[in-house]
């Protein structure tokens, strides 16, 4: 339960009921984060539109998108988002030790070598952008290129990092708790 009023699924009507149906089709259930949006169904639909697009469009693999989601969400202490996206990583057959390490402490997971190669560079960039956005430099983008990422992939890493920081802050700011 969030700190603001929420409409439960059984009481949803109209636009909100449609949004909940979309979420149910995609996730199998309406998670607490989306129930917090119930006070503004129009914003919920807009958010779902954007989320669906960034999930389907682009060139990054689903695995890399979910690695970013877990690392950023865990770094921000957003338990609801961390749990949801850790589940998606497991569904993509990412080793449980990697998922658990990232969900517990993404910085330590990188330092301990749970994630390596280009994915470590991606998550290092994502964590720096999450922690200290004002400290980002051209060298941070160059490190992504040096790891083999294309310009569209570099853009997508920045976009996804910013997106998950946004969602984490909405959830944390409204007191969303995992089920």
Which ranges hold each PLM region?
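Hydrophobic alpha-helical segments
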Residues: 1-179
């Amino acid at each position: 339960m969030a700190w603001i009023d929420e409409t439960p699924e059984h009481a949803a009507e109209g636009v909100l009921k449609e949004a909940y149906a979309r979420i149910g089709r995609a996730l199998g259930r309406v998670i607490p984060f989306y129930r917090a949006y119930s006070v503004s169904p129009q914003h919920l639909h807009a958010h779902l539109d954007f989320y669906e697009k960034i999930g389907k469009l682009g060139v990054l693999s689903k695995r890399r998108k979910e690695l970013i989601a877990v690392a950023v969400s865990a770094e921000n202490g957003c338990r609801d988002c961390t749990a949801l996206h850790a589940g998606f990583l497991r569904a993509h057959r990412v080793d449980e030790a990697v998922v658990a390490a990232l969900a517990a402490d993404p910085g330590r997971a990188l330092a301990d070598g749970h994630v390596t190669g280009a994915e470590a560079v991606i998550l290092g960039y994502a964590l720096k952008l999450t922690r200290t956005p004002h400290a980002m430099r051209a060298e941070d983008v160059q490190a992504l290129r040096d790891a083999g990422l294309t310009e569209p992939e570099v853009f997508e890493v920045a976009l996804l990092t910013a997106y998950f920081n946004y969602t984490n802050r909405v959830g944390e700011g409204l007191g969303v708790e995992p089920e």
